[in-house]
UniProtKB/Swiss-Prot annotation:
GO terms for molecular function: ATP binding; glutamate 5-kinase activity; RNA binding. Belongs to the glutamate 5-kinase family. It holds the Pfam family PUA. It is found in: Cytoplasm. This is Glutamate 5-kinase. It comes from Moorella thermoacetica (strain ATCC 39073 / JCM 9320). PANTHER family: GLUTAMATE 5-KINASE (PTHR43654), ISOPENTENYL PHOSPHATE KINASE (PTHR43654:SF1). ATP binds at K19, T178, D179, T220, G221, G222, M223, A224, T225, K226. Pathway: Amino-acid biosynthesis; L-proline biosynthesis; L-glutamate 5-semialdehyde from L-glutamate: step 1/2. Its EC number is 2.7.2.11. Catalyzes the transfer of a phosphate group to glutamate to form L-glutamate 5-phosphate.
Length: 378
């Protein structure tokens, strides 16, 4: 699909996930920018009134809490961050509920951590709950549960969370609204030569190098985390648009097919929900390194991983474990469920499928990781 075809197809999008960052929602003081919040709500209400379903992933709890608590700098300790999040989350939801109710819409607070999505049963429950809210005409407002999460209070987590939520609800598009108008060839704030990239067909190392550093004083993200979120969402088959959260009408313009922001084109085929869950899985239990041919077969041709393509195994994992598949350079290209334990894979790596039984004394599968239990990330 070309950029133009993809942009025109967005007019048919019916389920939207919109992520808005701290730098868009707050003043430089850290206090909530109520004018921007109200404008954003009006734009989302317009989309609901047009027959679309909207999920809002919002940052800003820590920043809002800092503003209310009078903190001038980011908290340095985890308890301080969580205290700021606890104060700020209440402020955020109070204002969202007020603004949406002015237009007759109900909102629901949904606080998630990766652990909620890593467990298969909790993942399905989250999926069903969000689907029920959308059927009832409620706008789910999602944030990370910063008050109790430990690992999740880190740079860019809500960018990643928005991509995971987009996969969770089977969104038609993910919007990442930020304080820049998209991905540029240089920092548009400091460089007059910066040029907006209207379309990214593949996230290459060169694209990643354009990301620059972290975000503003109050935010925890930056362009790098947005690119990683785009990588994840597009691997699900969901297009991603990075656009300005400071300018009015960006969402509507994108949905009309206008060339606004930077669009990341999705993979042609949408990943099955089971495959998507693999991306939510807890920390992988091992790593399998493959040769260039196997990497190409997995990424380009959608093939299973066979023993002949394996060059190294790291970790002591059992059959059924979630493993990371990396290319010869060590870059993760896929994630999947291993059909054999690590010790067995080490013995059959580089060998032909027909030799598995002779080497191991048994042969349960032809593949190390079957394509039905594998999601391509790179």
């Amino acid at each position: 699909m070309t950029e133009r075809e993809c942009r025109l197809a967005l007019s048919q999008a019916r389920r939207l996930v919109i992520k808005v960052g701290t730098s868009t929602l707050t003043h430089k003081t850290g206090k909530l920018n109520l004018g921007r919040m109200e404008r954003l709500v009006r734009e989302l209400v317009d989309q609901v009134n047009a027959g679309r379903q909207v999920v809002l992933v919002t940052s800003g709890a820590v920043g809002a809490g800092m503003g209310r608590l009078g903190l001038k700098e980011k908290p340095r300790t985890l308890p301080e961050k969580q205290a700021a999040a606890a104060v700020g989350q209440g402020l955020l939801m109070h204002m969202y509920e007020k603004f949406f109710s002015d237009y007759g819409l109900l909102v629901a607070q949904v606080l998630l951590t990766r652990a909620d999505l890593a467990d298969r049963s909790r993942y399905l429950n989250s999926r069903h709950t969000l689907a029920a809210l959308l059927r009832l005409g409620v706008v789910p407002i999602v944030n990370e549960n910063d008050t109790v999460a430990v690992e999740e209070i880190r740079v860019g987590d809500n960018d990643t969370l928005s991509a995971l939520v987009a996969g969770l609800v089977d969104a038609d598009i993910l919007f990442l609204l930020t304080d820049t108008g998209g991905l540029f060839t240089a920092n548009p704030v400091t460089s007059d030569d910066a040029v907006l990239l209207p379309c990214v067909t593949e996230i290459t190392p060169e694209i990643e190098a354009l990301a620059g550093g972290a975000g503003s004083t109050w935010s925890t993200g930056g362009m790098a985390t947005k690119i990683q979120a785009a990588r994840l969402a597009t691997s699900f088959g969901i297009p991603v648009v990075i656009a300005s959260g400071l300018q009015a009408g960006q969402i509507e313009a994108v949905l009309k097919g206008e060339e606004i922001g930077t669009i990341f084109l999705p993979r042609e085929h949408r990943a099955h929900t089971r495959k998507r869950w693999l991306a939510y899985a807890p920390a992988v239990q091992g790593q399998i390194q493959v040769d260039a041919g196997a990497a190409r077969a997995i990424c380009k041709n959608g093939k299973s991983l066979l023993p002949g393509g394996v060059i190294a195994v790291d970790g002591d994992f059992d059959q059924g474990a979630i493993v990371s598949i990396v290319d010869p350079a060590g870059k993760e290209i896929a994630r999947g469920m291993a059909n054999y334990p690590a010790a067995a894979i080490s013995r059959i790596k580089g060998r032909k499928t027909g030799e598995i039984g002779e080497i191991l004394g048994y042969k349960d599968y032809d593949e190390i990781v079957h394509r039905d239990n594998l999601i391509v990330l790179g």
